[in-house]
A protein has these predicted regions:
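ATP-dependent adenylate-handling active sites, centered on carboxylate activation for C-N bond formation
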Residues: 1-177
Length: 177
């Protein structure tokens, strides 16, 4: 939102999803409308996913289903950005899940358990998420900037009282919102 306000021209935003039950597309559109971005939805089909599967597995060098599932969308949206635009540098939301929670922290039994899980995921970022994202982005001749990965920002968020980060409002990543 800050970048959109400061920019003289509308920033470009992208979201990917399938037509059916596209809740992420809905929320991305709401944000895009709110900040006034030039928004592009990349609608994919089951066939698109299946046809990209072999490329993504080869790219990642793993058959781990969680890693592959998390990579297909990023790979396909980056492919679309490369093929349909002249954009070559992206801002991503990578690492926000690890810092502010997602499905795995929505039901943490306590704030301390939430914090412990966040710390574990931040420590393991380089092994999974950063590598996965870098490969999916760079194979499509794009570069990523990851503002949530700024070390000072990570330290700041990790130092926040876990009670304040725990999802008691039933809104994912509510502190980030």
């Amino acid at each position: 939102a800050v970048a959109a306000r400061k920019s003289k021209t509308p920033i470009r935003t992208f979201a990917i999803g399938m037509q059916k039950d596209a809740i992420d597309l809905k929320y991305a559109k709401e944000v895009a409308d709110y900040i006034g971005s030039e928004h592009t939805e990349v609608i994919i089909t089951k066939e698109d996913v299946l046809s990209a599967l072999e490329d993504v597995i080869g790219l990642l060098g793993t058959f781990d289903i969680t890693t592959i599932r998390a990579s297909i969308g990023m790979y396909l949206v980056c492919k679309a950005i490369h093929e349909q635009t002249d954009i070559r540098v992206l801002l991503t939301g990578e690492i926000s899940d690890e810092l502010f929670g997602y499905k795995y922290t929505d039901f943490a039994p306590s704030a301390q358990a939430f914090q412990k899980e966040s710390e574990k995921r931040v420590r393991e970022l380089h092994m999974y998420d950063v590598l996965r994202a870098d490969r999916c982005i760079s194979v499509n001749s794009l570069e990523a900037r990851v503002p949530f990965g700024d070390l000072d920002f990570v330290r700041y968020v990790m130092a926040i009282d876990p009670e304040k980060k725990q999802n008691v409002y039933r809104k994912g990543k509510y502190m980030l919102r």
